C-alpha cells in the first residue's frame, strides 16, 4: 500500500514502542491517522476535502463529531453514500447510536445502503474518486481514543481507482436501507437477510 519512507518509519516506530510498552508520539504530516492520537481530527479534515462525492464503507456509526462533518458536507452539495451492515456485529449502545445517526444522515439527504452477504472489516472513505482513507478505525469513541488503530491516506490513482471499483461493486449488490427507530425492535429482515452472529463484534 505504501513505500513512503515517513509512513514506513512511523509504522515501525509504533511497533517498537508498543512492543517495549513505551509512549508513541507520531507526527501528523505523514498521512497516517493514529489512535489514540489525532485520528479523529485527521478524519474530519479528510471529510472536509470533499467537493463532489463522499463514499463511506463503515459498519458502525457512533461518533457525533464525524456526523457533524458529514452533515456539513451534504449542506455544501456533496453527494454522500454510506454502506453499512445494519445490526450485524453491533451491540448496545453502538447499535442504538448507529441506527440514530444513520437515520439522521438519511434525513439530511445521504443515501444509506445495507451490504449483503460478507462484510468488509477494513473501513473506507473515498473523496471525489481521487483520494481514499483506508484503515481500522470504527466511527466510535473507543476506536479513536482507547485502542491502537491506524488509517492511511491514499492518493495513488491506481489504488484509489481499485478501491472505488470495489465500493461500486458492493454498492450495486446492496439495497436501500432505512434503519429502524433506535429504541425499537429491528425488522425481521435484519435477521432473515443475513443471520446476526452474537459472537461477532465490530471492535
List where the protein language model places each region.
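A short, well-structured juxtamembrane/interface segment
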Residues: 35-43
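DNA replication sliding-clamp ring fold and its partner-interaction surfaces
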Residues: 42-52
Amino acid at each position: 500500500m505504501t513505500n513512503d519512507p515517513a509512513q514506513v518509519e512511523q509504522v515501525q516506530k509504533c511497533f517498537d514502542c508498543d512492543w517495549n510498552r513505551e509512549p508513541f508520539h507520531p507526527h501528523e504530516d505523514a498521512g497516517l491517522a493514529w489512535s489514540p492520537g489525532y485520528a479523529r481530527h485527521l478524519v474530519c479534515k479528510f471529510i472536509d476535502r470533499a467537493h463532489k462525492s463522499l463514499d463511506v464503507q463503515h459498519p458502525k456509526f457512533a461518533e457525533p463529531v464525524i456526523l457533524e462533518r458529514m452533515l456539513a458536507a451534504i449542506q455544501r452539495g456533496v453527494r454522500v453514500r454510506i454502506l453499512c451492515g445494519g445490526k450485524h456485529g453491533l451491540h448496545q449502545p453502538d447499535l442504538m447510536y448507529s441506527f440514530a445517526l444513520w437515520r439522521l444522515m438519511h434525513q439530511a439527504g445521504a443515501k444509506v445502503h445495507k451490504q449483503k452477504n460478507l462484510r468488509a472489516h477494513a473501513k473506507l472513505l473515498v473523496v471525489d474518486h481521487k483520494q481514499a482513507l483506508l484503515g481500522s478505525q470504527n466511527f466510535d469513541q473507543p476506536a479513536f481514543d482507547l485502542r491502537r488503530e491506524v488509517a492511511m491516506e491514499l492518493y495513488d490513482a491506481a489504488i484509489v481507482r481499485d478501491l472505488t471499483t470495489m465500493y461500486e461493486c458492493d454498492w450495486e449488490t446492496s439495497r436501500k436501507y432505512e434503519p429502524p427507530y433506535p429504541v425499537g425492535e429491528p425488522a425481521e429482515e435484519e435477521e432473515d437477510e443475513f443471520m446476526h452472529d452474537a459472537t461477532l463484534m465490530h471492535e
